[in-house]
């Protein structure tokens, strides 16, 4: 990925600027939900051939438009880099895999506790499976083009193993995407999730729906396995 060249600031473009503002807003919401903490997690939104990416090493609840990186999806050149010493997101190679493999228009990477706990609970499983929840009606079969799940369907979200460096996850993520055409999310063990969508709205909703399933499942599991719980 080449460094940004001297050219007019693409952030003045209305669509790109709007994407940058949305990223700041969504990151604050993710922070309040406890799905990103400190500088962890990441998000990107695409408009045409331009992809706007939150930086690495910046607290997500304090992001501003000027902090964003902008890249050309076609050339992989950076069209805008922040003036301060910000680093491109370590998630960028994974975001690019999602964009090119699924023709997505946004991708969110959380560091939620629920995803981490779930990956430990199902340490021997290849997928998290869910069935019978009404929220499943809002989750697409990989893409809205394929329709949506019904509450009686079984949703299967693949697990992939974590790596020492975020960028090294790309091959694991790509394999999971290729082998699971009807998923819109992947769980990274002891790390978090990547969820995407046909628009930023879809990516946000898919993230929220998947995290909801994790939360409900874990609460149900705790109740059923707690020695202090009694049912009458």
From Swiss-Prot:
Q: What is its main location?
A: cytoplasm
Q: Which GO terms describe its biological process?
A: L-methionine salvage from methylthioadenosine
| Free-text remark on how the cofactor is bound | Binds 1 zinc ion per subunit.
Q: Which reaction does it catalyse?
A: 5-(methylsulfanyl)-D-ribulose 1-phosphate = 5-methylsulfanyl-2,3-dioxopentyl phosphate + H2O
**Enzyme class (EC, first level):** lyase
Give an example GO molecular function: zinc ion binding
Question: Subcellular localization, per the record?
Answer: Cytoplasm
E.C. no: 4.2.1.109
Xref: Gene3D superfamilies? Class II aldolase/adducin N-terminal domain
Q: Which InterPro entries match?
A: Aldolase_II/adducin_N, Aldolase_II/adducin_N_sf, MethylthioRu-1-P_deHdtase_MtnB, Salvage_MtnB_euk
Residues reported to bind substrate: 91
Indicate which residues the UniProt annotation says bind Zn(2+).
Answer: 109, 111, 191
Alphabetically list the UniProt keywords.
Amino-acid biosynthesis, Cytoplasm, Lyase, Metal-binding, Methionine biosynthesis, Zinc
> What pathway, per the record?
Amino-acid biosynthesis; L-methionine biosynthesis via salvage pathway; L-methionine from S-methyl-5-thio-alpha-D-ribose 1-phosphate: step 2/6
Query: Which Gene Ontology CC terms are recorded?
Result: cytoplasm
Into which family does the record put it?
Belongs to the aldolase class II family. MtnB subfamily.
Q: Supply the HAMAP family for this chain.
A: Salvage_MtnB_euk (MF_03116)
Please describe what this protein does. Answer: Catalyzes the dehydration of methylthioribulose-1-phosphate (MTRu-1-P) into 2,3-diketo-5-methylthiopentyl-1-phosphate (DK-MTP-1-P).
Under NCBIfam families, the record lists: salvage_mtnB (TIGR03328)
Q: Name the chain's protein.
A: Methylthioribulose-1-phosphate dehydratase
- Name of the gene encoding the protein in the UniProt record: mde1
């Amino acid at each position: 990925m080449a460094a940004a060249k001297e050219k007019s600031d693409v952030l003045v473009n209305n669509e790109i600027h709007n994407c940058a503002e949305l990223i700041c807003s969504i990151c604050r919401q993710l922070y309040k939900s406890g799905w990103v903490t400190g500088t962890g997690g990441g998000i990107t939104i695409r408009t045409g051939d331009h992809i706007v990416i939150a930086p690495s090493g910046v607290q997500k609840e304090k992001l501003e438009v000027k902090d964003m990186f902008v890249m050309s999806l076609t050339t992989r050149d950076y069209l805008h880099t922040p003036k301060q010493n910000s680093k491109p997101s370590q998630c960028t190679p994974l975001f690019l895999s999602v964009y090119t493999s699924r023709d997505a228009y946004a991708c969110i990477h959380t560091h939620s506790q629920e995803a981490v706990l779930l990956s430990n609970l199902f340490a021997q499983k290849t997928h998290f499976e869910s069935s019978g929840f009404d929220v499943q009606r809002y989750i697409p079969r990989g893409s809205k083009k394929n329709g949506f799940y019904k509450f009686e369907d079984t949703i299967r979200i693949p697990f992939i193993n974590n790596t020492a460096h975020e960028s090294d996850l790309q091959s694991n993520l790509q394999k999971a995407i290729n082998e699971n055409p009807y998923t819109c999310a992947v769980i990274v063990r002891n790390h978090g999730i990547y969820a995407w969508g046909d628009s930023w709205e879809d990516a946000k909703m898919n993230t929220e729906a998947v995290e909801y399933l994790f939360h409900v499942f874990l609460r149900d599991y705790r109740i059923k396995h707690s020695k202090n719980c009694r049912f009458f």
